Amino acid sequence: MFDTPAVFARITEAAAEAADNAALRGAVVAILRDVQNAGRAAIAEGFAEDPFAARPLTRAYTYLTDGMVKTAMYVASEILHPLATPTQGERIAVLAVGGFGRGEMAPFSDVDLLFLTPYKITAWAESVIESMLYILWDLRLKVGHSSRTVKDCIRLGRDDFTIRTAMLEHRFLAGHAPLARSLDQRLKSELYKDTQREFIEAKLEERDARHRKQGERYMVEPNVKEGKGGLRDLQSLYWIAKYIYEVKETAELVPLGLFTPSEYRTFVQAEEFLWAVRAHLHLVTGRATEQLTFDLQVEVAARMGYQDRAGRRGVEVFMQKYFREATRVGELTRIFLTKLEAAHMKGAPLLERIFRRRRRIKQGYKVVRGRLDVVDPEAFLADKLNLLRIFEEALRTGMLIHPDAMRLVTANLDLIDDGMRNDKEARRIFLDLLLKHGNPERALRRMNELGVLSAFVPEFEPIVAMMQFNMYHSYTVDEHTIQTIVNLAQIEKGELVESLPLASSILKAGVNRKVLYVALLLHDIGKGRPEDHSILGARIARKVAPRLGLSKADCETVEWLVRYHLLMSDMAQKRDISDPRTVRDFAKAVQTTKRLDLLTVLTVCDIRGVGPNTWNNWKATLLRALHAETKRALEMGMEALNREGRGNEAKKALRTALSDWPAGEVKTEIARHYPPYWQGFNVETHVTFAEMLRQLEHSGDPGGIEIRLDPDEDRDATRACFAMADHPGIFSRMAGALALVGANVVDARSYTTKDGYVTDAFWIQDAEGHPYEAARLPRLSQMILKTLKGEVVARDALKSRDKIKKREKAFNVPTHITFDNEGSDIYTIIEVDTRDRPGLLYDLARALAAANVYIANAVIATYGEQVVDSFYVKDMFGLKYHSEAKQRTLETKLRKAITEGAERAAAS
C-alpha cells in the first residue's frame, strides 16, 4: 500500500537529480501521486469485492494518507529546509486531528492537521509547513490545517467545543514526539478535567441543532454523516465516552456497563453499514458527498449488491436497511446517555429538559430521573400484557420510558405471541393507545422503534423503515402512517380548524373514531408487494381488524376504507369534478354520507402525511367541492346533479352579476355558450369571460386575443383566461405559451361558443408551486401574447428547456395510457400516466391536435416526478373514441410524443 523505504529511495534519487527545490517538490509530488493512485485503486478494488467491509477501507485510506503526510514532512524538514542544529524553539510536531486523527478516513475525507510548535512560530517552521502544504495540495488532498502552540490549544479549546473535540482525537504523525506528549498531558489536566458535563451539554446542543437542520431520520434523502441516526451521532457517543472515560475503542464501553455485548454488536453493525454507504457515496461521485440523494441511492444500492425483486426495487430494500440502522443508532444514543446520567450527572436529565407535571404512577413502575422505569423486571415479565401496558402508562403520565425499560421490552418481544394478540385485554390496551389519550403518535412511534408494534401486528413489520422510491413521499411507509395519525389527532383536538375546516367540522359532528384510526394504521399495510397495495391491504385489514376487537360492521368499513383509500384523491385530482358523471360515479361507490365523511377525513390525513408541502389550497378546494357535490347527490338524489338544472342556476347567477349590462347583451352572452360551459366555471369566471368576449367584439379585430391573469387564492394558483377566435390546435398553442414562460399547469378547461370563439382557462403556478406574484403578471401576459401571435415558436424555444434534473433521472416511471368512455357522458377521458417534465402537456396536446382531437378539459395531477394528465376529448365530429383501432392509433402518437420529448430532455 505505502512502501516507505521504496518511496524514500525514489525521493533520495530524485533529490540528487533535482536542479532546485521547486523541481524536487514536483518530483516528490509525482512519486507520491503514483503511490496514491495505485493505493486508491487497490482499496477501491478490494471494496468492490466486499462492498460491506468498511473497516478495512477506512484503515487503508488512513494508512495511505499517513504515509503521504509523513513523507511530505520528511521532505520539507529534512531535504527542502534542513536544520543542522535546531534551537529549542525550532521544533515542530505534526498531528492528525478530527476523523483523520481517529483513523477513520473515507475516500475523500478532509485531512485535518495540527502543526504544533513550542513557542511562537519561527521562520523555519513556517517554511516547513508551507512546503508540506504545497505538496499535499498538489496531491489534491483537501487539507484543513492550523498552526498553534500548546498554550494556544488550551486557550482556544476552552472557548470552542469544535476545536476541543478535534483535539480530543489527536494522533501524532511526525516531528517532535515529546511536544505532542506535552499537549496530551496538558489537555487532560488543564482542559478536560472537571468539565465533563459542560462538554456533554455542548455536544448534545450541537446534535440537536444538526438534527433540526437535517430533518428526521425518516427523510428519504438522508445525510449519512450529519443526519439523524447517522455517523455523527455514533461519533458523538464515542467523543463523550472518550472525554469521560479516556477509552480508545468503543468495545471498552461494555466492561464499563454503558453497553451490553448485544448493544455493542448493534453499534458495530450500524457503524460498519453507515461507513460502507459513505465510502460508496465518495467513490461514486469522486468527492466528499454525504447526502444520499435519489440518483446516488440507486448507484450505491447496486454497488452493495441489492437487486430488484417482485414488487420492490433493490434501492428500496437498501434504503429500508439504511433507515432500520438509523433507528438503531437512535436507540443506542438513548441507552448511552441514560447510563451516563445515572453514573455522572446531576440536575435535569440530558434527554428531557422540559419540566413535566408529575402524575401518580401505577404499582410496578418507578420514576428514574424523570422517566418511567420498571420496579421488578421479573414481575413485569410475568404478565406479558405489561409489554403493552407500559406504553399506556407512559401516555397517561406524560413521561418518557426509561431506556432500561426499553431494553427489557426489546429483549422479550417473543412474549408477544398469538395468545396475547387475541387477548381481549391486550386489544383494549392497544385501542386505548390509539383512541384515549389524545397523542397516539408518541406511543406508536416508540412501539414501532422498539419492535412492539410489529410484534403485536405482524402484518405491519414489512413496511417498517420501507422507503418508497419516488419524489412524492417524504417519509418511510411506517413514518407516513404515523404522520397520518398525528394529523387525525390534531384535527380531533381542534388544532387545524382554520386550515382544515371541512375535516374539522366532520369530526366535530361525530364519526366512528375507532374505524378511522384503525383504517389509517392499516391503509398502506399492503405496500412493497407486486399486488395493488389497496387490494392487498384490504385483505390484510379483513384479518387484522377483527383481531383488534372491532365489530363485524366496523371491520367491513375499515376494509372498505383501506380498499378505496385513494379513490377520493384520484377522483378529485384526476377527473373533472364539474362533470356530473364524476360525482355520480363517486357517489355510487361511496353509497352513504357516513362513508363519504370517513373517506374525506382519511384522504385529508393521508395527503397531509405524505410530506411537508403536499397539502395545499388547490387540493383542499377540489376535495371540498367533491365532498359537497357528492353529499348533495346522496341526500337529494342523483337528479340533483342534473346538468340542465345546474346550468340554469349558473345562468341566473350571471344575470345577477351583469345587472348593469343592457338586457340584449346579457341575452347574447348567455345564448352563445353550450351546456358544459355553465358547469365548468364559477360565476366570477363567467363574468370574466363575458367581459373578454365583449371586448373582442367591440375591438372588431378578427385576430384579437384577450388575456386575463388573476390570482385564485382559493386554489393556490393564478387563473389565466384566454378568449379569441376558435381554430384547430388552439389548446396546444396555449399550453406551449405557458410552458415557455415556465408555468406549471394544474388544471385547464376549454369551451367553444356557438358564434366561433373559444374560452380557455388555465390554472398555473410558478416553478416553486406557488401563484405568480402580482408584479410579474403584466410581463407574463406580454410573453404569452407574443407566443400566441406566432412571434415566438414554442416548439423551437422549448427545446433548451426540456431538462430532467440529475437526481430525478434515477426514477423509473413507466408510461401508462388508458381510454375511459364511462367516466363522462360526453367525452372520452384519455389518462396519460408518465414522467413529468417541462413542456410535457404541450407535447401531448400538440400530438392530439395533430390527430384532429378536440380537447375540452385537461386535469393535471402531479406526484413528485410522476404526472397524470387526463384529457377530456371528442373527435372532429363531436363523438367519443369507441373504436379500439382509433384508440391504439392515438396511444401510439402520444407515446411517440413522450419518447421524443424524453430523448430531448436526456440529451440536453
UniProtKB/Swiss-Prot annotation:
Positions of the HD domain: 477-599
CC cofactor: Mg(2+)
Region named Uridylyltransferase: 1-360
Molecular function terms from GO: [protein-PII] uridylyltransferase activity; phosphoric diester hydrolase activity
Pfam families: ACT_ACR9_3rd, GlnD_UR_UTase, HD
Domain (ACT): residue spans on this chain: 719-801, 829-904
InterPro entries recorded: ACT-like_dom_sf, ACT_dom, HD/PDEase_dom, HD_domain, NT_sf, PII_UdlTrfase/GS_AdlTrfase, UTase/UR
Catalytic activity entry: [protein-PII]-L-tyrosine + UTP = [protein-PII]-uridylyl-L-tyrosine + diphosphate; [protein-PII]-uridylyl-L-tyrosine + H2O = [protein-PII]-L-tyrosine + UMP + H(+)
EC number from the UniProt entry: 2.7.7.59, 3.1.4.-
GO BP of this protein: regulation of nitrogen utilization
NCBIfam families linked: PRK05092.1, UTase_glnD
Official protein name in the record: Bifunctional uridylyltransferase/uridylyl-removing enzyme
Native organism: Ruegeria pomeroyi (strain ATCC 700808 / DSM 15171 / DSS-3)
Gene it is expressed from: glnD
